[in-house]
């Protein structure tokens, strides 16, 4: 797997201001699969997992991000689901900048990996693609 050494996070698409001022939909639209894979490849998979120590629910962040980088979004969801039953909510409202992303090694000199954005993507992908009885 090739690493993406881009110093900045993949930008999150947002609604056009002229559209969003007429609705109550989310402003941030979320990543596409290609964007999520590209952002996940920014993770350098640190041996001591500082991002995981910053996660209050203990998600195995390097493992779920590794699955996203490989395009295995369902496996990523299963990793998150072991520790959190609300990944779509946490991916949107958890203060990642002071928790997991705040501990990300990439964030020392550049922008940290977009862990919350990836968690949101995985949860949304699961909701849209996995049909349970």
Over which residues does each language-model region extend?
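Ferredoxin-type iron-sulfur electron-transfer modules and their immediate structural context
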Residues: 1-133
């Amino acid at each position: 797997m090739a690493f993406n050494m881009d110093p900045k996070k993949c930008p999150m698409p947002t609604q056009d201001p002229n559209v969003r001022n007429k609705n109550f939909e989310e402003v941030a639209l979320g990543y596409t699969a290609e964007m999520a894979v590209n952002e996940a490849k920014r993770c350098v998979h640190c041996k001591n997992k500082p991002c995981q120590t910053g996660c209050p629910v203990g998600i195995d962040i390097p493992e779920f991000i590794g699955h996203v980088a490989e395009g295995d979004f369902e496996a990523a969801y299963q990793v998150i689901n072991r520790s959190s039953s609300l990944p779509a909510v946490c991916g949107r409202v958890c203060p990642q900048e002071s928790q997991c992303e705040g501990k990300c090694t990439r964030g020392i000199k550049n922008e940290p990996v977009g862990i919350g954005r990836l968690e949101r993507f995985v949860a949304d992908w699961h909701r849209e693609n996995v049909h349970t009885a």
